[in-house]
Amino acid sequence: MVSQEPHFELRLASSPEDIRAAQRLRYEVFVAELGADGALVDHEARLEADRFDPFFDHLMLLDHRRAVGEQVVGVYRVMQEQGAKAAGQFYSEDEYDLAPLKSSGRRLLELGRSCVHADYRGGTALIHLWTGLADYIVTHEIEILFGVASLHGTDVAELAAPLSLLHHRHLAPEGLRPKARAAGYQDMNLIAEDALERTAATRALPALIKAYLRLGGAVGQGAFVDHAFNCTDICLILDTALMSEKHRALYARGRGI
């Protein structure tokens, strides 16, 4: 994958050192910045890891202008069905019943742990990652993308507006609608649709979730409150067959960046 900005390199992790570099960035974003924690988080080495990392492909954006060891500025991890079989499950299955997706007969790709270094937000970094993801999707003939996406915090009262908007306007078709598991289940129908301030609710959604919705994405039933990661998760689903022609063309080009 060749970038039009020569200081950037976009590629898949190919060594344990690469994966540790991705985990370092994830630590800075998810742990140091957002307050997450987990059983395999290494605070001394500043690495955010979990048991699923060996089964994912790790898409990394590097800026070669930075010091060695600090060049990874964006990451995305993706897992196909064979990775999930090797791991024993998809990552999202801890929080959602994925039976509707797994029985669909469609080719699935789980997305997760997307993050960009603070100095690169609002620029081209996320665009590079998304274009590289598009290349991966075309190469592997992926039909459905899914994964958990997070709203920061676990105070459901503060998240009532964006969760209600997702429930009323963006539920996935029933045949492709995962349901949050009982252990952390949170009803998203918290504010009646006619009482919802839609502009404010939309503004409260994280940029990544809004981007998926613009592509035609939808959400599963219920949110999952994740206290360990200090967030409230939703399950995003994107059926590439239902994307607009404009956005499908982006994926069909399949030429990376």
Predicted regions and their residues:
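Conserved N-terminal entry element of GNAT/NAT acetyltransferase domains
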Residues: 1-16
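Short, His- and charge-rich active-site/binding loops that engage polyanionic ligands
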Residues: 55-101
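Long, continuous compositionally biased terminal/linker segments
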Residues: 235-257
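Short alpha-helical segments and helix-capping/turn motifs at coil-helix boundaries
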Residues: 43-46, 57-62, 220
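A short helix-loop-beta-strand connector motif used in the catalytic cores of GNAT acetyltransferases and
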Residues: 49-60, 86, 229-234
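Extracellular structured ligand-interaction cores
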Residues: 7, 56, 73-75, 108, ...
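An N-terminal domain-cap segment
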Residues: 13-55
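Acyl-donor binding region in acyl/amide transferases
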Residues: 81-218, 223-232
